[in-house]
Amino acid sequence: MRSDSLIKAVIIAAGLVLGLVLSATPSALAGQFSIGTWKTAQTIAPFYYADFVSGEDSVTVYPFTNPADQKNALLAGSLDMCGTTVAHAIHSASMGQPVVMVAALCNKSSALVVRKDAGIEAVSDLKGKRIGYVPGTMHEILLRETLSRSGLSAQTDVSLLRIDFFDMGLALSRGNIDAFLSGEPFPALAVEKGYGEILAYPYYKEAVGDINAGMLVTRDFVKKHPEKVQQLVTAHARASRHLARHPDQWLTRASAFGTQKSVLEKAAANMELAWDMDAAFVSRVRALGQRMQALGMIRRQPDYNALIDLSFVQQARKELTADE
């Protein structure tokens, strides 16, 4: 009888252990990191984390096509860290979602493109024209800011047409639109193919500047595993620095995502791999949040002190300095 009871106890204990393992989030598994990002040249850094973590650690990168899906996977516990646009991070935080931005991912990477030989030489020439855009994105904000600075109303002076980023080039080449504002490599591709030309790079230092995307973790991950967050942020910083110092390697690897290297070389000057954040970065994030609320994209401002944690990049800065 005692033997039967002992066997039963062992089986129950084993079942409990198995249940804990199966229900564990990635962060609970020591040395195993799950990261989400896009397959673009400007968001490539996570694919290099494995080169900059300790030998016992492993990194699995999951590609996504949009920031919302990455963030949802993060909140569900399927990812330890993910990329997102700064605009989406603000939107998520304004809704009370427990996300924390712990590093930048990329800056710049956007451009306003017009049809080649269409006689559009200044933003003011877009009056009465059709412009492709994706609502609710960073690019919509940049487009509206660019139009406003040239005295144009997005409501009355131009026609904004909702077009997916992947379809903008075709629409421009066919004459269905006169311009579009999107992220790289689509502007460079329009130039490479000969149907478009760059009208403007929509970066305004006294306002939003050139911020674009960052890396998110959950508040719970920061609280329970700060040392793992630091590992990832430092790996991100080292990967970003390595790629910036080796542009040929960066663009060659990025071309495997489906864009010709010649196009990426045209786009390279407009793409900035990033990791560091400082007070100026936070000020630009706040400015972006104000623009989003003015446009009705968010109802209230998030708590920026809770959204952005500078401590991890500050430590990474020290570690990278020590590397030199």
Predicted feature residues:
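Short, glycine-/small- and polar/acidic-enriched structural segments
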Residues: 31-155, 159-162, 171, 178-184, ...
